[in-house]
């Protein structure tokens, strides 16, 4: 990964931040990703990448972006979206370095009511400094 690090360092020299979109099971390389990139996006729970377990391991080195299962955006309900958001905010937001988003993307078939619930959760819980008492 030294060549990746060199590319990111060049971007940093120009004042840029670099996000890594990386699907799948990345535990074997999570420390390298956190060392190189400013943000890690697409934290895919279905591949064993639990945002609540990632935060204490690399949350002080990189921004974590995700938490709302993209499968739930397609097949779930506003209630499942709210559960995903509550878990992500509780586990990843305290101390900063968290951006709420889908675990992948807003795929074809995403339900508008679930996207709107993401926005409601963001509006309700997503302003720093995070207040953990809001999640109950």
How would you name each of these model-derived features?
Residues 1-136:
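Active-site loop segments of alpha/beta catalytic cores
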């Amino acid at each position: 990964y030294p060549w990746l690090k060199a590319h990111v360092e060049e971007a940093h020299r120009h004042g840029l931040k670099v996000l890594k979109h990386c699907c799948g099971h990345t535990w074997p390389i999570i420390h390298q990703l956190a060392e190189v990139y400013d943000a890690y996006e697409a934290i895919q729970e279905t591949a064993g990448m639990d945002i609540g377990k990632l935060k204490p391991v690399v949350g002080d080195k990189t921004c974590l972006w995700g938490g709302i299962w993209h499968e739930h955006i397609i097949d779930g309900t506003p209630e499942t979206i709210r559960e995903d958001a509550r878990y992500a905010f509780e586990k990843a937001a305290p101390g900063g370095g968290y951006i709420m988003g889908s675990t992948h993307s807003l795929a074809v078939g995403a339900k508008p009511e679930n996207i709107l619930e993401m926005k409601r959760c963001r509006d309700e819980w997503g302003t720093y400094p995070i207040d953990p008492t809001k999640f109950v």
